[in-house]
């Protein structure tokens, strides 16, 4: 079994991700979104009945993928015998033949030709606007429904103005086939109130609202309501 006990919001996300093929999740900093999505990918990879299951975590840079996600993958597979890690390629090979790759969005041409049974796109607003519609979405097409299992894409991140992540957030709010969720620090209880007060007192208001209150309006040039 995976040594992971989800928090309440993480359990909500797992339930939603199990139902919806597409999901956009906006979370405050340190909410646990990366831990949740990696464990979701890991669970699905271990349980998949497809031949050669392939799951992916895509970050804006190689360094971010390694720094943010690699150690978590090792931590949560520590009790699973037969796992093999390729440090150079940031690849986890599971004993059932499934594979989880950590990928970088720095050169999208290197991603062309892959197939994916499930992918997390972390901070897509820091990547090319074409990387999902032209590269990732086609990779989800041919194996959807194989052995009764859907392929899926999960977008996670923190707001950074009106970029492509903001566009996907608005799409998810309007499209019933998409799941959309926002978790603000003032609502989740993940970070103690005392720590939030300390952060608010030491950060510019826009920065605090963006990082902890999930504001897409903070630090947007020309925004009418920037606070």
Briefly describe each language-model feature range:
Residues 126-203:
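ASCE P-loop NTPase helicase motor core
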Residues 188-227:
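ATPase catalytic-site recognition across NTP-hydrolyzing enzymes
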């Amino acid at each position: 079994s995976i040594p992971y006990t989800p928090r309440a919001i993480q359990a909500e996300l797992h339930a939603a991700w199990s139902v919806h093929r597409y999901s956009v999740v906006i979370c405050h900093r340190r909410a646990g979104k990366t831990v949740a999505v990696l464990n979701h990918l890991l669970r699905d990879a271990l349980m998949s009945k497809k031949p050669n299951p392939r799951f992916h975590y895509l970050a804006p840079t190689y360094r971010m993928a390694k720094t943010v996600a690699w150690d978590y993958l090792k931590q949560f597979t520590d009790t699973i015998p037969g796992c093999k890690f390729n440090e150079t390629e940031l690849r986890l090979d599971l004993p059932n033949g499934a594979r989880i790759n950590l990928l970088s969005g720095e050169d999208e041409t290197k991603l062309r030709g892959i197939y994916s049974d499930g992918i997390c796109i972390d901070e897509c607003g820091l990547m090319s606007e074409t990387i999902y519609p032209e590269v990732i979405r086609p990779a989800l097409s041919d194996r959807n429904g194989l052995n009764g299992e859907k392929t899926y894409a999960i977008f996670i991140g923190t707001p950074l103005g009106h970029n492509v992540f903001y566009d996907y957030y608005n799409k998810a709010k309007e499209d019933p086939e998409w799941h959309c969720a926002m978790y603000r620090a003032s609502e989740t209880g993940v970070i103690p109130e005392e720590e939030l007060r300390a952060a608010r007192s030491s950060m510019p208001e826009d920065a605090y609202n963006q990082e902890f209150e999930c504001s897409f309006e903070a630090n947007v040039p020309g925004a009418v309501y920037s606070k």
